[in-house]
Curated annotation (Swiss-Prot):
Keyword entries, A-Z: Hydrolase
Pathway info: Xenobiotic degradation; nitrobenzene degradation
Activity vs pH: Optimum pH is 6.6.
SUPFAM superfamilies: YjgF-like
Species: Ectopseudomonas oleovorans
Self-association state and partner proteins as the record states: Homohexamer.
Main EC class the enzyme belongs to: hydrolase
Disulfides per UniProt: none
Superkingdom of origin: Bacteria
Gene3D superfamilies per UniProt: RutC-like (3.30.1330.40)
InterPro entries: RutC-like_sf (IPR035959)
Enzyme Commission (EC) number: 3.5.99.5
Protein name in the entry: 2-aminomuconate deaminase
Phosphoprotein recorded as keyword: no
Length: 54
């Protein structure tokens, strides 16, 4: 889908933003992409494991 001049979008299938920030925001000719991480849609972190023995 395309973004109009001052539109914002949260991308389906990606982790829900932790704050009130969209994944993508267009402002005129500028396109802003929010910081991304290895957080999965289920809020687990790729490559991180829980050590339950401690």
């Amino acid at each position: 889908s395309t973004l109009s001049s001052n539109d914002a979008k949260v991308v389906d299938g990606k982790a829900t933003p932790l704050g009130s920030f969209p994944h993508v925001k267009r402002a005129g000719d500028f396109l802003y992409v929010s910081g991304t991480s290895s957080r999965r849609p289920d809020n687990t972190i790729a490559g991180a494991e829980l050590d339950s023995t401690s």
